[in-house]
A protein has these predicted regions:
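Compact soluble domain cores
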Residues: 26-39, 44
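Short glycine- and Lys/Arg-enriched binding-loop motifs that mark or flank ligand-binding interfaces
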Residues: 39, 48, 52
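Enriched for short, Lys/Arg-rich terminal
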Residues: 2-4, 10-27, 44, 51, ...
């Protein structure tokens, strides 16, 4: 498992929107990303493996409504979503 961090275009747009709109949530997202890079399957945000059509993906809680969804690949971690609970991947 590599240390590269990539975002889908949608996830990057969501991430940047949080940076502009809500610094408290943006800071929480940044903490989650750091934790994901250190220990992708444990740590803060209640890491949870996803099921069914999202098998292979993991999520962590940003808020009660919002999740960060990611996939750990050989080259590193890919952030899929930084917003609504399990929407599109």
């Amino acid at each position: 498992m590599g240390k590269d961090l990539t975002f889908t275009q949608t996830a990057w747009n969501e991430y940047m929107e949080w940076q502009r709109q809500d610094k408290k949530i943006a800071n929480k997202i940044n903490e989650l990303i750091k934790s994901i890079q250190r220990t992708p399957f444990e740590g803060i945000g209640k890491p949870e493996p996803l099921k069914e059509n999202l098998t292979g993906f993991w999520s962590r809680e940003i808020t009660k409504k919002h999740r960060i969804v990611y996939k750990v690949e050989e080259s590193g971690t890919k952030i899929i979503q930084v917003e609504n609970h399990y929407s599109d991947k």
